[in-house]
């Protein structure tokens, strides 16, 4: 029996996918990435050779994608596009791969994955922000002791605290929404020689067909579009990790100021009520800095095409989007329906809360203006 380890439902970490509720499974899978290569080739035929577009589409539609087999063959040439184009041209070369190089198709396919995957992260962040806004409004005057450098400090309000979470989450969502996902089209050495002088015209049409951003430039060896996406994702992961860390602290037995709606148990200690969602969020988010570092290291894209640095991006960027989605999803689960033990909070307060309520109100104003 053929192994199913490359089935589209298992091409990513199962734990990571389930933690993100599964929504990001399809957009970031290896199968979708490879299918997007075909999507880009079909769009390129329309943009570069419209007279052959129908034949190219028929060729692509007739192609039977075998993810496992194509992945094996990709190792021989260093990327999956080489054997894919060979297969397509063997069926009918008309309209296939006009004026493009492997990097054009692969980078554009990756951007299709990321546009959808990042959009799913934004949706989760917005859900979290809505819940935080409700929490902030409800508890803007709820007194709690502030803590700095791990020690009891001065009184504040729980709403002021969650207001800080809210603004950071909203900022992270807006940064992701502002990202551009550029199409790539430059040809063999990035100078559009084969299609001169129509290169940028074709690029613009290709961007339109795919719903991607037209950079009006060739970015083969400029990997800043990748690091821009990666930075925004890693920032979002860090933002929710901070929230998760706070929830874990406030949920400690000796603190007891918060309790998740559905806390996790223990296989050996049945009395425990672990803040499982916050803990999982922390775990996923901790993977983001290492993935981000790999992508920044890939900025060293030598000459006109990276030797290994470019190849390192394909899985790493999708993995970063996946762990960020999982982290945000777990943070949203942690906050949704969380119990705020106001009496326990108040029992530790030793004075007035100052102007903390004003800060909670301001956080709500900032959030409201950003979404109006």
Describe the role of every protein-language-model region.
Residues 172, 187, 219-303:
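Glycine-rich anion/phosphate-binding loop at the beta-strand->alpha-helix junction
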Residues 14-17, 142, 203-219, 256-257, ...:
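Acidic-glycine-rich active-site phosphate/pyrophosphate-binding loop
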Residues 43-47, 87, 91, 131, ...:
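Generic, well-ordered alpha-helical scaffold segments in large soluble proteins
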Residues 25-29, 69-71, 264-280, 302-319, ...:
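Short beta-alpha connecting loops at secondary-structure transitions
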Residues 162, 196, 203-236:
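Conserved beta-strand/loop scaffold segments within soluble protein domains that form the structured core
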Residues 115-122, 126, 133, 163-166, ...:
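Short amphipathic alpha-helical segments with heptad-repeat character
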Residues 1-186, 192, 200-205, 214, ...:
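A helix-coil-helix interface module used to build multimeric assemblies
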Residues 287-359:
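Long, amphipathic alpha-helical stalk/connector segments used for oligomerization, subunit docking
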């Amino acid at each position: 029996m053929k192994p199913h380890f490359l089935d589209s439902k298992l091409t990513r970490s199962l734990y990571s996918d389930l933690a993100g509720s599964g929504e990001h499974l399809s957009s970031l899978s290896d199968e979708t990435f490879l299918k997007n290569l075909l999507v880009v080739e079909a769009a390129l035929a329309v943009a570069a050779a419209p007279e052959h577009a129908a034949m190219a589409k028929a060729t692509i539609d007739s192609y039977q994608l075998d993810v496992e087999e194509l992945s094996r063959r990709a190792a021989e040439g260093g990327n999956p596009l080489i054997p894919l184009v060979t297969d397509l041209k063997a069926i009918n070369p008309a309209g296939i791969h006009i004026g493009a190089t492997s990097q054009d198709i692969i980078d554009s396919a990756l951007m299709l994955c990321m546009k959808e995957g990042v959009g799913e992260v934004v949706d989760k962040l917005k859900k979290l922000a809505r819940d935080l806004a409700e929490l902030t409004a409800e508890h803007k005057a709820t007194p709690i002791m502030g803590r700095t450098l791990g020690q009891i400090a001065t009184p504040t309000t729980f709403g002021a605290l969650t207001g800080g979470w809210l603004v950071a989450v909203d900022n992270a969502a807006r940064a992701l929404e502002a990202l551009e996902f550029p199409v790539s089209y430059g040809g063999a050495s990035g100078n559009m020689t084969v299609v001169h002088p129509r290169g940028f015209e074709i690029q613009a049409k290709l961007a339109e067909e795919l719903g991607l951003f037209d950079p009006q430039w060739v970015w083969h060896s400029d990997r800043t579009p990748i690091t821009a996406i990666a930075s925004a994702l890693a920032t979002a992961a860090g933002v929710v990790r901070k929230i998760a860390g706070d929830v874990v602290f406030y949920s400690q037995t000796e603190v007891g100021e918060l309790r998740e709606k559905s806390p996790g148990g223990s296989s050996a200690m049945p009395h425990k009520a672990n803040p499982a969602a916050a803990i999982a969020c922390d775990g996923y988010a901790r993977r983001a800095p290492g993935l981000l570092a790999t992508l920044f290291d890939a900025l060293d894209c030598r000459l006109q095409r990276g030797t290994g640095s470019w190849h390192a991006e394909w899985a790493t960027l999708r993995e970063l989007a996946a762990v960020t989605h999982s982290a945000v999803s777990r943070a949203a689960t942690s906050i949704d329906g969380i119990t705020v033990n106001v009496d326990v909070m108040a029992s530790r307060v030793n004075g007035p809360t100052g102007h903390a309520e004003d800060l909670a109100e301001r956080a709500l104003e900032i959030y409201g203006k950003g979404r109006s």
